[in-house]
Swiss-Prot record:
Its EC number is 4.2.1.59, 5.3.3.14. Pfam families: FabA. Homodimer. This is 3-hydroxydecanoyl-[acyl-carrier-protein] dehydratase. The active site is at residue 70. Keywords: Cytoplasm, Fatty acid biosynthesis, Fatty acid metabolism, Isomerase, Lipid biosynthesis, Lipid metabolism, Lyase. GO terms for biological process: unsaturated fatty acid biosynthetic process. PANTHER family: 3-HYDROXYACYL-[ACYL-CARRIER-PROTEIN] DEHYDRATASE, 3-HYDROXYDECANOYL-[ACYL-CARRIER-PROTEIN] DEHYDRATASE. Necessary for the introduction of cis unsaturation into fatty acids. Catalyzes the dehydration of (3R)-3-hydroxydecanoyl-ACP to E-(2)-decenoyl-ACP and then its isomerization to Z-(3)-decenoyl-ACP. Can catalyze the dehydratase reaction for beta-hydroxyacyl-ACPs with saturated chain lengths up to 16:0, being most active on intermediate chain length. It is found in: Cytoplasm. HAMAP family: FabA. GO terms for cellular component: cytoplasm.
C-alpha cells in the first residue's frame, strides 16, 4: 500500500476525531486549535536532514478567532499558535509513520519570532524538517521548523520534540 503524501482539511478533521490513524493513536486538535488547513507534502525522505519533511498551510482571514482577542485594536496571531502548529505537524508525522500512541509536545530548543501574522495576510506556510525519529520504548521525533506568511519567513524553531505514548497515565 502506498502512503498518502498530501492531506486535505477533511483528512485533518478526521485525524482530529481519531479516525485517520486509529483509536488511541496520534490526533490533531479540533478546531479552533487546529492550526493547519492542509498538508501539501509529507515524506519520510528529504528535508534538510534527509529524514523527512512536511509542508502545510493555514488560510488566514480577518474572522479567525484569535484576531478578536489578541490584541484588541492591534490584532495579531499569537506566536505560540505557530509554534503549536509545528508541534502538531511533528506529531502528525509520527502517526503517519504508523507509530502507536497519543502525541505530546515535549519541548523545543531555540525559538525565534521576527515577524507577525496580521488579519490582512493570506496564507501561513509551515516547513518541518525531521532530524531524527526514535523508535523503541519511547517513540519520538525531533525536527526543525519554520513559519512563513505570504512567502516571508517569520518564525523558526530548532529541536521541536514530540513523542507518542500508548499510556499517558503517568505523564
Amino acid at each position: 500500500m502506498t502512503k498518502q503524501h498530501a492531506f486535505t482539511r477533511e483528512d485533518l478533521l478526521r485525524c482530529s476525531r481519531g479516525e485517520l490513524f486509529g483509536p488511541g493513536n496520534a490526533q490533531l486538535p479540533a478546531p479552533n486549535m487546529l492550526m493547519v488547513d492542509r498538508i501539501t507534502h509529507i515524506s519520510e525522505e528529504g528535508g534538510k536532514y534527509g529524514k523527512g519533511e512536511l509542508v502545510a498551510e493555514l488560510d488566514i482571514n480577518p474572522d479567525l478567532w484569535f484576531f478578536a482577542c489578541h490584541f484588541e485594536g492591534d490584532p495579531v496571531m499569537p506566536g505560540c499558535l505557530g509554534l503549536d502548529a509545528m508541534w502538531q505537524l511533528v506529531g502528525f508525522f509520527l502517526g503517519w509513520q504508523g507509530l502507536p500512541g497519543r502525541g505530546r509536545a515535549l519541548g523545543s530548543g531555540e525559538v525565534k519570532f521576527f515577524g507577525q501574522v496580521l488579519p490582512e495576510a493570506k496564507k501561513v506556510t509551515y516547513n518541518i524538517h525531521i532530524k531524527r525519529v526514535l523508535k523503541g520504548k519511547l517513540n519520538m521525533a525531533i525536527a526543525d521548523g519554520s513559519v512563513s506568511v505570504d512567502g516571508r519567513e517569520i518564525y523558526t524553531a530548532e529541536g521541536l520534540r514530540v513523542g507518542v505514548f500508548t499510556s499517558t497515565d503517568n505523564f
